[in-house]
A protein has these predicted regions:
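Class I SAM-dependent transferase core
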Residues: 2-64, 100-117
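Residue-level signal for inorganic ion chemistry
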Residues: 26, 83, 165, 208
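Glycine-centered, small-residue-biased loops immediately flanking beta-strands
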Residues: 159
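Short strand-turn motif at the edge of the Rossmann-like AdoMet-binding core
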Residues: 164-168, 192
Length: 230
């Protein structure tokens, strides 16, 4: 099944053993804490790992060679773990507020020997990393205007944020215009791709660039971010 990663421009041959190890570790662990709803290897790869690694479409297009990446709401490890497996030169901080999921991420990093993966158990709006990261990512957390406020304060000016979205992305982009203006950022690209599932499942990476410093008032407290999104 790993040959499907060639569609994303990835050479998987040197990474297949580590991916297999992670997938089995994930399935075994998920029986304990229910990381995803459907526990089988093929679905895990096609729905979650392949989707996570679509990041390479952005990475190649924008010639990203290295840097520090903050993944917001890493949960069961997507996209953080597959990215850490494939991209040795990207140092990844995986943030999540659920202790049992951070425990899983720490054990996954140790099991796979991932020196470039650093799990952190904190709420996104409470992270102590203002303007420290070159890159950001978020998958399956919230609507775009919400996750932008969670993520952009932690990026350096000129940094890129990648949001994994369905093809309803255009509506989310429209609703995020106030947030983009307030946070001094803009959507610069939308990269579409298709998951290798039996049914057609199209997705999009929304690429956001931070153009200037984020005002100090952001991110606001979590209750405000959710109840009164920008």
């Amino acid at each position: 099944m790993f040959e499907k990663l060639e569609n994303l421009g990835l050479d998987y041959k040197n990474k297949s053993a580590m991916l297999e190890k992670f997938m089995q570790f994930f399935i075994d662990y998920s029986r304990k804490i229910n990381l995803i709803s459907r526990n089988d290897i093929e679905f895990l790869f096609e729905k979650h790992i392949y989707d996570s690694l679509s990041f390479n479409l952005f990475k190649e297009k924008y010639n990203i060679k290295s840097g520090r990446l903050l993944d917001i709401g890493s949960g069961g490890g997507f996209p953080a773990v597959p990215l850490a497996v494939f991209f040795d030169d990207i140092d990844i901080t995986a943030a999540d507020s659920t202790e049992k999921k951070i425990k899983f991420l720490k054990e996954a990093a140790e099991t796979l020997g991932l020196k470039n993966l650093h799990p952190v158990c904190r709420r996104a709006e409470e992270l102590p990393f203002k303007a420290e990261f070159d890159l950001g990512s978020c998958r399956a957390v919230s609507e775009l205007r919400v996750i932008l406020e969670y993520a952009l304060p932690y990026l350096k000016t000129g940094g890129f944020f990648t949001a994994y979205k369905s093809l309803k992305a255009e509506e989310e982009i429209k609703n995020a215009q106030n947030a983009l203006k307030a946070l001094n950022a803009e959507v610069i690209d939308r990269i579409e791709y298709t998951l290798p599932l039996e049914e057609t499942h199209k997705r999009a990476l929304i690429i956001v660039r931070k153009n200037a410093d984020t005002p100090e008032i952001y991110p606001r407290k979590n209750g405000i971010i959710l109840k009164k999104p920008l």
